[in-house]
Amino acid sequence: MKLVLVSTRGVRSLNSTNFPAPWPFVKKGAFGQRKIGPMNYEKFKWPGQNREFPELSPKFQKLNPKELHRYTGVQADGFHDEKTGEFVPVKEMRSELVVPNLDGFKLRPYVSYRTDVQIEKRRVAYEKKVLEKGSERLADLHTVEDERWPPPKMSAETLFELAYGDTVRSAYKEGKYGNK
């Protein structure tokens, strides 16, 4: 085996180790997908190298400015006094929510009239199904969930019916749950 002396001073020479192939060729000892072409490794990607973070983050850089020691990305509601070194809160800089008083406001949020028609259709159809089958439980078994109104509340029994109801009923009819 031939050892190659490579400069450690950061100087590039015409040594072949400084000029790797643009992609790994399929050969003995290749790893990953055995193909010819460029390969991207996630382990070599560091956060911030391609400007993923717009803020200057001391986490991924060697410089660690004092201004960013307790940086949270939140606008401060005051300033640091350089003479005393203390934080001075300013009332005008404090963020506040401005919510209008809607007491006595006549308008309501807009909902399309077509929605009301669809809801009414679903309610009437479901009530007919309840009258036809005799109870809400039987009507629920014979109604698609999207056609029910009001929509069903999910209970343990409903979940069991949706997941195992048909198989348990068919197994019971076949006599698999009898005394043996």
Swiss-Prot record:
Give an example GO biological process.
Answer: translation
Q: Which UniProt keywords apply?
A: Mitochondrion, Ribonucleoprotein, Ribosomal protein, Transit peptide
Task: Quote the Pfam families the UniProt record gives.
Answer: MRP-L27
An example molecular function term from Gene Ontology annotations: structural constituent of ribosome
User: What would be one Gene Ontology cellular-component term for the protein?
Assistant: ribonucleoprotein complex
InterPro entries registered for this protein in UniProt:
Ribosomal_mL41 (IPR019189)
Feature: transit peptide: 1-21
Q: Where in the cell is it found?
A: Mitochondrion
Family label = Belongs to the mitochondrion-specific ribosomal protein mL41 family.
- What PANTHER family does the record point to? LARGE RIBOSOMAL SUBUNIT PROTEIN ML41, MITOCHONDRIAL RIBOSOMAL PROTEIN L41
Q: How does it assemble?
A: Component of the mitochondrial ribosome large subunit (39S) which comprises a 16S rRNA and about 50 distinct proteins.
Protein name per Swiss-Prot or TrEMBL: Large ribosomal subunit protein mL41
> Which organism was this protein described from?
Caenorhabditis elegans
Query: What would be the name of the gene that encodes this protein?
Result: mrpl-41
